[in-house]
Amino acid sequence: MLYRLARAGFFQLDAEKAHDLAISNFKRFTGTPFDLFYRQQLPHRPVQCMGLTFKNPVGLAAGLDKNGECIEAFGAMGFGFVEVGTVTPRPQAGNDKPRLFRLVHAEGIINRMGFNNLGVDHLVENVKRAKYDGIIGINIGKNKDTPIEKGAEDYLICMDKVYPYAGYIAVNISSPNTPGLRSLQYGEALDELLAALKTRQAELAAKHDKYVPLALKIAPDLSDDEIQQICQSLLKNKIDSVIATNTTLDRSLVEGMKFANEAGGLSGRPLQNRSTEVIKCLYKELGEEIPIIGVGGIDSYISAKEKLLAGAKLVQVYSGFIYQGPGLVADIVKNL
């Protein structure tokens, strides 16, 4: 009830202004009596994945807390893990505004943010300060002005800096809002990137006496053949997990709606079925060898369960959380 009232007010604002206000309030309320408005005590539902123990299988997807400013607040809401970022080596402003749009009737969101963030060094300081006993995933990307052929260098820079502080590292090569980025999902480009990341992972594991798993985040806009090729690269390079999926460019389910023609990636309920199909295809190829983190359109216990039955080991929410609030986390965790 409280969230529905708050949402009514937030939804009167521009989508990005509402997001920024929410982040600001979470920062302000953390550790004060006001965090009672969103703090939840949820049952323990531990899950083993990537050699880590997650308090429960419901995580916050990357993109909501890009700079790691509200990790404790999201932990208080009952998330079993929190993924922050996407972060890049250098700060960048992202794409021009407006760049975030609600498709309210479809419970969807279109964004073309463009990896706006304050840079990896800023994020690392926030992660170091966070008082959160759950798993923190750190999602890394490349700067917009880094040529795609040198993209691996940006991922390695970020990896070096976040490695000591991350529970796992998510490699984002699937955002549709950085020109050319999705080309890294294919063929030799993917193999070369994954090989470089695994080599650096081994070096950093020896240096820090700590093994931090790598998860690759992929797009939903892939053919079955392309997914199979990605799976071959994942297996060949012994990547620890795959996150399925990022946002979609497909607009078939929202055609004619306000903002449907805005450029960017679509998330939320319109992505629900397609992301589950991708998970099924991944599981067919990977089985239990490489765990899958399912994300895309989860807005209820039922849709979360569908992802788990399709083969996902963990799930993440973002758009569903925007529309439903912390109660969505409780609904899923309590019913598992």
From Swiss-Prot:
Its required cofactor(s), as named, are:
FMN
Binding-site residues, substrate: 66, 111-115, 172, 177, 246-247
Enzyme Commission number: 1.3.5.2
**Enzyme class label:** oxidoreductase
UniProt binding sites for FMN = 62-66, 86, 139, 172, 217, 245, 268, 297, 318-319
Q: How is the cofactor bound?
A: Binds 1 FMN per subunit.
Main location group? membrane
Name the HAMAP family for this protein.
Answer: DHO_dh_type2
Q: What is the protein name for this chain?
A: Dihydroorotate dehydrogenase (quinone)
Task: Give the organism, scientific name.
Answer: Vibrio cholerae serotype O1 (strain ATCC 39315 / El Tor Inaba N16961)
